[in-house]
Design a protein with these regions (language model features):
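Active-site/acyl-donor-binding loops of N-acyltransferases
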Residues: 2-31, 101-105, 113-169
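Residues at or immediately preceding the N-termini of alpha-helices
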Residues: 42, 105-108
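Flexible loop/N-cap segments at domain edges
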Residues: 76-81, 85-88, 95-101, 109-118, ...
Length: 169
């Protein structure tokens, strides 16, 4: 969002409420790291979110398909295991994870290692996670991402995660 858009939204009662962390990381070579790879589909993403974030509020698969158009055009891939999932695309020698959920740091690392083996010429990754997510705590630069306007009594959204919104840039 541009500063002008942010100001306009603030004038309409919106407040900054959601943040992300971007984490650049080296990805180790590990032939033993295994994961499943799928094309990005709304159905698959909804299944994984329901499994890893059971209390999530999300669009239906039909509505999600519209939001995922940008990921389709970038050639995004879903990588998953029993303990983690991520959505990534490759640009040159870097994997860009635009969403990742894992039980712990090691599970996330295993996904990145498996993706490195699949993509071959990759050495590093940039991971985007919610600011309050427990993955790689203390790492990464915080970036404001979303805004909210409460219609009634405000409530705490500091632990909330908002991602894969419809963006125009």
């Amino acid at each position: 969002t541009s500063p002008e858009q942010t100001s306009l939204l603030q004038e309409k009662g919106f407040h900054k409420a959601f943040a992300l962390r971007c984490l650049p990381r080296e990805v180790e070579r590990n032939l033993w790291s295994q994961a499943d790879f799928d094309s990005v589909t709304a159905k698959k993403l909804c299944e994984l979110r329901a499994r890893f974030w059971p209390d999530t509020v999300m669009l239906t698969p039909e509505q999600m398909a519209v939001v995922l158009g940008d990921l389709y055009s970038r050639g995004a891939t879903i990588v998953s295991s029993e303990r983690a999932y991520g959505i990534y695309f490759r640009k040159e020698n870097t994997l860009y994870f635009v969403e990742m959920m894992a039980e712990d740091d090691r599970s996330a690392e295993e996904l990145m290692e498996a993706a490195r083996e699949k993509e071959v010429i990759v050495e590093k990754a940039v991971i985007t996670v919610g600011a309050a997510q427990n993955l790689f705590l203390g790492e990464g630069a915080r970036q404001e991402y979303g805004m909210i306007r409460f219609e009634g009594e405000p409530f705490d959204v500091s632990e909330s995660y908002l991602r894969l919104m419809m963006e125009n840039g």
